[in-house]
Amino acid sequence: WVEGYIVGYVDGNSIKSARLFETSSKKTNILIADDTLNVAVTDCVPVQLSTGSSYIDVRNALNLAGNPDKLRCRVKILGAVTKYMGVAGLKNAREHEFVDD
């Protein structure tokens, strides 16, 4: 499990295309960070939101295109920690829980 605040998304194939504190028309990924204050791209972990049957519930619940109200929400996500978008990230997110502050 990884835990953090949803702080944006990546608009491309590299963390260099990160968009902080913006909603998205994309459903493919989100960025999470330890807090919502003084966030830099280097503080973020990209999370892949896959389309497979094991992952679609997480994608539908967390993507910022369909859920702009989830920006700045705290969440725990279960997936595979691996390189994604050129940095350490999370792929195959298959479970999630929203966390109260």
Description of each model-found segment:
Residues 1-101:
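OB-fold single-stranded nucleic acid-binding module
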